[in-house]
């Protein structure tokens, strides 16, 4: 079960870092209509 806990922690950390960078520096992608 420890492997599952370590995997969950790893995914959570990566997700937090990704969202932090995403919100701090919005991606400069070409707008294809929509929002």
UniProtKB/Swiss-Prot annotation:
Keywords: Chloroplast, Membrane, Photosynthesis, Photosystem II, Plastid, Thylakoid, Transmembrane, Transmembrane helix. One of its GO terms (cellular component) is chloroplast thylakoid membrane. The keyword Membrane applies. Its main location: plastid. It is found in: Plastid, Chloroplast thylakoid membrane. The chain crosses the membrane at residues 3-23. It is a single-pass membrane protein. GO terms for biological process: photosynthesis. InterPro entries: PSII_PsbT, PSII_PsbT_sf. HAMAP family: PSII_PsbT. Found at the monomer-monomer interface of the photosystem II (PS II) dimer, plays a role in assembly and dimerization of PSII. PSII is a light-driven water plastoquinone oxidoreductase, using light energy to abstract electrons from H(2)O, generating a proton gradient subsequently used for ATP formation. Belongs to the PsbT family. This is Photosystem II reaction center protein T. The lineage of its organism: Eukaryota, Viridiplantae, Streptophyta, Embryophyta, Tracheophyta. The gene is psbT.
